[in-house]
Amino acid sequence: MWKLKIAEGGSPWLRTLNNHVGRQVWEFDPKLGSPEELAEIERARETSLKVRFEKKHSSDLLMRIQFAKENPRGAVLPQVKVNETEDVTEEMVTRMLRRAISFHSTLQAHDGHWAGDYGGPMFLMPGLVITLSITGALNTVLSEEHKKEMCRYLYNHQNKDGGWGLHIEGPSTMFGTVLSYVTLRLLGEGANDGQGAIERGRKWILDHGSATAIISWGKMWLSVLGAFEWSGNNPLPPEIWLLPYMLPVHPGRMWCHCRMVYLPMSYLYGKRFVGPITPTVMSLRKELYSVPYHEIDWNQARNLCAKEXLYYPHPLVQDILWASLHKLVEPVLMRWPGKRLREKALRTVLEHIHYEDENTRYICIGPVNKVLNMLCCWVEDPNSEAFKLHLPRINDYLWIAEDGMKMQGYNGSQLWDTAFAVQAIISTNLFEEYGPTLEKAHMYIKKSQVREDCPGDLDFWYRHISKGAWPFSTADHGWPISDCTAEGLKAALLLSKIPPDVVGEPLVEERLYDAVNVILSLQNADGGFATYELTRSYPWLELINPAETFGDIVIDYNYVECTSAAIQALTSFKKSYPKHREEEVDVCIKRAAMFTEKIQASDGSWYGSWGVCFTYGTWFGVKGLVAAGKNFNDCFGIRKACDFLLSKQLPSGGWGESYLSCQNKVYSHVEGNRSHVVNTGWAMLALIEAGQAERDPTPLHRAARVLINSQMENGDFPQEEIMGVFNRNCMITYAAYRNIFPIWALGEYRCRVLQAP
């Protein structure tokens, strides 16, 4: 039976700043599990398989089964149901909230954070399996149980047409299909295994132009594997790292996720590295293409891209650039004396790879650069300490649910979910009943704050300050983020107002000041806030975005979510510490509010870049403006936002927004006009903040009825459609949102609507 282990090390090759607080790793123990538990898990798997085309999202049941045993509850209050003709009462809401918080508390790990599925993208695990296969570590790192669950996941998420999507809910793409197919083959599945599933996948690939039409990231992965030629790739010259920083195209000016992925890619491209050509690789050369491998026109393949994966088409200027580099520059750099420049560039790139590894304890900023960096360390020296330090951190990215084992989009969303959960529970004004839960969460927040900047010259390493920031996940990961810092600060300030005998001692003032310093340092010239760093270059740099399937990735753009979170955190801080950097804080809030108003769409919405989508963005937009001192009566933007949200309320009383809103940038309802508990929670929170109850509380009563009636018998909420997004086009799971936002919305509803004088 699989067991989730929290805050444990277990390897001499693991490094940590805080005794692994927040670390979540699944391990298989064949001796664990009663017959009843094993039968329950098997039923969950069978159900997941049966409904896989209708319900593509796991309900995270393996963790729930484990925690139900480890964190038993007392008697569960009776379920609440509200008829259409019945009024929602305070007693109903209070009982529902107690049921919800009691259940959510059982999902809290002993170190204080909430664990959960952060999967969704289908292109992450293939990079890991390809890297482990090349380095010969596949069978060392992955047990037979790991491989079985990875295969289960891939088979479960194959679409009806035989292909795989970019993410679990997406239509089939060449990128998703080729990489998933290759992964199954490397995991030991035969070319005709899977009850015809692999054959259907191969047919999809060949029917849609073969693997020559995979996007550039896929071309790179196939090239290092040996199932594609480097001459079929557009150039990724490592020499770009030797350019003067003053140039707008210097990678140090790019969004950190972008530069941290293209950093190791450029190393592998610069060396034209190819792994061992095994019998499986030789077979893939036949299976993936419609013509013999040696007859493929690799030069033509450079710019081929299947229409199913083409979200961001190459502009002409990019095609000219790649052709020039490919035909004129690369031949010079591959031979003496140009080769000396290449060797210098490769050394520089390796220095930056090692710096990233060491300062994230070998977790790395994300799963793509994690496995690429690991591969580069092996290419440099297969017996290196760096490669050995990478291996145990693979487990930090793996998550298992009833649909199988996946690779997550980060090493978790621990701090993010915990900060939101704290705010949700406190919003109910029932927090004294849940002191132990909040005390553990408080401990996690305190232990996860980044305590020091990265070492060395930050300008040389293209890093921003991080002392005082909060990361998205764990202190060991350590990358500072504007909105995570803001949400961490908000939660810490709320907890500081509750007696220490209930939630523990508050964070010391100096550490609050450090957090404020980080937030103030991240405001851009136009008043907005980006994610990890200041915006360092220009939007026109998107012209050289080579990733055909992602949008807006080259620079760190401003976002309404980050800007609003900063406003909220600073206004909360100002109430407790009005004299600390008073003028700077006031100016920052004012400029951020002006930016928020400026980017509002004409229909009253804000586009959400990290959640689905206009509902999410509009919640942040309204919250930010209200926190900055504006209200419905004096702010046209807030009035427009309320009109927008009310116009999207469904006949059921809820809201339900599809991920299609993100990629098409037009509001789209969930299929069948179904409501979604998370969208409904976001919309309620925005409307309550904007004073909807004072004008007409009916929409709020109707929405509250939807949330109450959605609650399950045990106090949990159903997992519905996917609610997270990144880079416009790829969806990602936030498993805790289904619990957090109904609690938060009904907590605010209880205190600010039903209990209003």
From Swiss-Prot:
Superkingdom of the organism of origin: Eukaryota
EC identifiers of the protein: 5.4.99.8
Molecular function in Gene Ontology: cycloartenol synthase activity
Ranges of the PFTB repeats in the UniProt entry: 147-188, 512-557, 589-629, 638-679, 700-741
Cellular component, GO annotation: lipid droplet
Record-annotated active site: D483
Keyword Repeat annotated: yes
Enzyme class: isomerase
One Gene Ontology biological process: tetracyclic triterpenoid biosynthetic process
Coiled-coil segments: none
This protein's UniProt keywords: Isomerase, Repeat
Reaction catalysed by this enzyme: (S)-2,3-epoxysqualene = cycloartenol
Keyword Chaperone: no
Protein family: Belongs to the terpene cyclase/mutase family.
Role, per record: Oxidosqualene cyclase converting oxidosqualene to cycloartenol.
Name of this protein: Cycloartenol synthase 2
Gene name of the record: CASBPX2
